[in-house]
Amino acid sequence: MKILVTGATGFIGAAVARRLSQQGHEVLGLSRSGAAAAKLRAAGLTPIVGDFANPASLFEPATQVDAVVSTASIGQVEGTPESFAKDRDAVQVMSEALGDSGKPLIFTSGSAIFGVFTKG
């Protein structure tokens, strides 16, 4: 399968992309910079241009694959309502791109949704 992994240079996304590649899938990693593209190429992945901060940029890449695994987020641990809205919009755009194709969109989440915890 040809699979797009968003967040493929991050902790979870890199592990997912690596495992999919090891299983023989063609993995495309979302890249918003030259440095990220180089990191993806070094890992044996194909970089594809897109940015969660610009959800419309994700439509075309999502139409070119058999599945999407979304592990990216522009929100940080202390995300803002705006960053969470961009994340939501990005996933929605990819979902719309897949439409009624029957191709899966797998959405993951991170611990940031729980906010910042301190010991005590």
Residue positions per predicted region:
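Residues at the starts of beta-strands that form the adenosine-phosphate
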Residues: K2, E26, T46, P104
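N-terminal Rossmann NAD(P)H-binding glycine-rich loop of SDR-like oxidoreductase domains
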Residues: I3-H25
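Rossmann-fold scaffold of SDR-type NAD(P)-dependent oxidoreductases
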Residues: T6, D66-T71, F107-T108
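Short glycine-/acidic-enriched loop or helix-start segments at secondary-structure transitions
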Residues: A15, K39, G79-P81, G115-K119
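Anion (oxyanion) recognition and catalysis
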Residues: S21, R41, G99
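Residue-level preference for short coil/turn positions at secondary-structure junctions
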Residues: Q23, T63-Q64, D100-S101
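Conserved Rossmann-fold NAD(P)-dependent oxidoreductase catalytic core, especially the SDR/UDP-sugar
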Residues: L28, I74, D89-G120
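NAD(P)H-binding glycine-rich loop region in Rossmannoid oxidoreductase-like domains
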Residues: S31-E96
